[in-house]
Amino acid sequence: IYTDRTTEANMRKEEEKPDTIHQLLDFLKTHYDFRRNIIMDRLEYLDFNEKTEKWIGKLRPVRATSYNAIFLELQLAGIKCSLDYVKAIVNSSYPREFNPFTDYIEKLKPWDGVTDYIGQLAETVQTEDQEFWKKSFRKWFVGMLACALQDEAVNHLVIILYSEQGKGKSTWIRRLLPPEWREYYRNGMANPENKDHQLMLSTHLIINMEEFDGARISDLAGLKRTITQESVTERKVYDMQTLSFIRRASFIASTNNRLCLQDIGGNRRFLPSSVISMDYRTPVNYEGIYAQAYALLNGGYQYWYEGEEIDELNRHNEMHRMKDPVEENLLVYFRKPEPEDTCVKWMPAAAILSKIAIYGKIQVNRQAIQTLVLSLEKYRFRTRRNAQGSTEYEVVDLQNDEVNKGFGK
């Protein structure tokens, strides 16, 4: 019997009356458990009659084949509806919302208030400055949990683990997350110009920058912006409009280069530690470390640096900073005056750079001038304005014998 498309559509609508909705919902409730993972922004389901061993009792992402399988079961059960109708019901407000981070934390037993589980985990890494490492790791770890649980919180700190290859840095880092959260871990740098990388700030908990060795100065400038980024504004492939997503990711890095920092202006976001040894085989007490971190967070623990702590951090980070030749040569050929000095000069940055360029074989350009000015400010050389309005710096211009004496000759 021939029927036109209009007739077929009307017949389908007739089949999909409200009774069909109730039949379908009853069937879904008795055969499946659906939830919407708000971190990954995806539907997940559990089939109560699952036959595949790896998925028995476990939820998994809803795929196109999942809809097809559900549609087939509905037809076999005598519930007549279209595949699009099934998709519309499943991908609606029907599934419960699920946050894997709050779900895990809320099921933990409260911390006993005594046992330092985070400190015990930190002790599995032995460093050249153990006190700095333990303090910085505690701050970063609590900040990581804050970033995961609190919509307004942002972890501005980046742990950097330095050692030669083969110490197990990446393995140790990967084990910071419990098995339930392993899919929220990622290896790789975060490119602020890459939309997918930006979205990962919302869908991942730890981003391990294993390629930190190869980061250029321009890369680090973009990385600093990303580290402090509060939210992600992008349009996903299947969305019709640009949306704002909560930032949840925290950064950690591993490097084989001791001098891994480059910014002369300060590196207070970075927490570098020189690793002597790592124990990545002892089981991690996930319940303990996360219950303690949650208690510290709720108790108002300060997981960021401020005031004198920042000054101490910057002094520590100097041991891991690659100094620019302009900065190093400034301290070779000039110094700050002492009260008893009589041969004091007031010189503009360009004049200072001219001498450095001659003796230090440094190219004179805008970048060199900028680096020199930053260096003069960093070491707090006194300044004044001359009659022409240019800035001059108070220096002692070292003579050859003084320069050679500085080299130990």
Predicted stretch roles:
Residues 261-280:
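A short helix-turn-beta junction within AAA+ P-loop NTPase domains corresponding to the substrate/partner-engaging
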Residues 220-243:
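Conserved catalytic/switch belt of AAA+ P-loop NTPases
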Residues 92-202:
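P-loop NTPase catalytic core of nucleic-acid-dependent motor ATPases
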Residues 282-317:
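Long, low-complexity, charged/polar intrinsically disordered regions in eukaryotic proteins
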Residues 196-202, 236-254:
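AAA+/SF3 P-loop NTPase mechanochemical coupling elements
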Residues 204-228, 261-266:
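Conserved AAA+/SF3 P-loop NTPase catalytic/coupling segment centered on the Walker-B
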Residues 1-116, 131, 360-363, 394-409:
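N-terminal nucleic-acid engagement/recognition segments and initiation subdomains in replication
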Residues 304-409:
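DNA transaction DNA-binding modules
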